[in-house]
């Protein structure tokens, strides 16, 4: 029974791209389905996701980052040097509206997430290296994301880097630290919770995506062609 439940959880998690498309369609057709989630719930949802990620990490994971400093350093530098500049170039070349330009640059300035680790696992790549890169870039993002967003997007709209910094501390660093501590002192319960955390993370991401699309329905429908094109170019360029 437990094994079957685990298989269902993995299946539901691996179908994340499909759920994202379905949620996007529902949010644009029937916005009320997701507007209840609310802006204030986004930070809470992201915090829970980072808490779940922290519960899968141990002190050894942090030590492993330093065992391949050149590879990790190259990955982190590529993440924060190439992607933000690429996002800013796309926003400028495609003349995106200010809100979309800032959003694209912010996405380009963020670290890799847990979804990248899942993709590496499915591709039978080096999962340990992917986790190390995600961990290193997440830590670096505490300083780099506010700085780069302010630098590249500040002329579109006012960007408060210190507010971004404080938000990342509360939403990323604090729950991540709590999760690591939980795994350190209460490994059994952390292991049990970690079995469900990927699915919980997927559900929360879907709620966040659904709310954002529902909340910005008019803007998205008015600019869907240029928005879709810019996001696809950003991610294809990242690969």
Give residue ranges: language-model regions.
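Alpha-helical transmembrane segments of multi-pass small-molecule/ion transporters
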Residues: 1-239
